[in-house]
């Protein structure tokens, strides 16, 4: 597959056109950002680790009946995906209070939530990905009511797959962010990635953080935590 012009560069990935107008190549970078890119860093192997984790999980989600943009892993840093139009509404699914949820609502971090909480943010680096509701998304034309209904349905299906998957590997899935895209047919599919960049992972025994919070909160050991998550994700149980 020939990698063509760069279509988009985000904080953690680059997206390239290919000779097939219906497919892209996604390249994972080693860059790390936090607080809407106000804090920046990088470490060797980060992109390859996130690519490997995503490339391991997405086919399993597909097998569970959840449509994704993923086609195949091409190299350590690259994967081939279906070309989608990203819905500019990020979805956060929370199982345990943490991060901005705890700060915003005064709920102690680590408090289990009696049911999953689904939140929506407008995908805009310039505005800091502000929290929105579904009425706002529909009124401003970012997504239709049917799109949002399907997105919520898929997000909860993904949650129901991932929680026991990680539990079997000694990891608590605290919360996670998802992005969805639309195929030319109008079908909604999971896009982006599932990795320590987009999820909060805590060790099930110690509650040690094994995700980007290690960078975000200056805890150190980011590379080691990401490498450990790759080992656990790919562990046969």
UniProtKB/Swiss-Prot annotation:
* EC number from the UniProt entry: 6.3.2.6
Q: Which UniProt keywords apply?
A: ATP-binding, Ligase, Nucleotide-binding, Purine biosynthesis
Q: Which PROSITE patterns match?
A: SAICAR_SYNTHETASE_1, SAICAR_SYNTHETASE_2
The pathway to which it is assigned is: Purine metabolism; IMP biosynthesis via de novo pathway; 5-amino-1-(5-phospho-D-ribosyl)imidazole-4-carboxamide from 5-amino-1-(5-phospho-D-ribosyl)imidazole-4-carboxylate: step 1/2
**Which GO molecular function annotation, any one, does this entry have?**
phosphoribosylaminoimidazolesuccinocarboxamide synthase activity
Q: Which domain of life is it from?
A: Bacteria
Indicate the secretion signal residues: none
Q: What class of enzyme is it?
A: ligase
One GO biological process term is: cobalamin biosynthetic process
Which pairs of positions does the record mark as disulfide bonds? none
Task: Give the similarity note.
Answer: Belongs to the SAICAR synthetase family.
Q: What is this protein called?
A: Phosphoribosylaminoimidazole-succinocarboxamide synthase
């Amino acid at each position: 597959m020939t990698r063509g012009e760069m279509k988009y560069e985000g904080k953690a990935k680059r997206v390239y056109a290919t000779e097939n107008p219906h497919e892209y190549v996604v390249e994972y970078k080693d860059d790390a950002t936090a607080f809407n890119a106000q804090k920046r860093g990088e470490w060797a192997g980060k992109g390859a680790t996130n690519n490997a984790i995503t490339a391991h999980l997405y086919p399993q989600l597909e097998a569970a009946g959840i449509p994704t943009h993923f086609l195949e892993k091409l190299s350590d840093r690259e994967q081939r995906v279906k070309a989608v139009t990203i819905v500019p509404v990020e979805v956060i699914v929370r199982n345990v209070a943490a991060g901005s949820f705890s700060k915003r609502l005064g709920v102690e971090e680590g408090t289990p939530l009696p049911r999953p909480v689904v939140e929506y943010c407008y995908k805009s680096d310039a505005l800091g990905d502000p929290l929105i509701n579904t009425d706002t998304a529909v009124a401003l034309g970012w997504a239709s009511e049917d799109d949002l209904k399907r997105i919520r349905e898929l997000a909860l299906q993904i949650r129901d797959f991932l929680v026991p998957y990680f539990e079997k590997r000694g990891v608590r899935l605290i919360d996670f962010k998802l992005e969805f895209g639309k195929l030319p047919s109008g079908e909604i599919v999971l896009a982006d990635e599932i990795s320590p960049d987009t999820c909060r992972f805590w060790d099930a025994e110690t509650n040690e953080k094994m995700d980007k919070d290690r960078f975000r909160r200056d805890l150190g050991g980011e590379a080691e935590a990401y490498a450990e998550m790759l080992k656990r994700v790919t562990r046969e149980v």
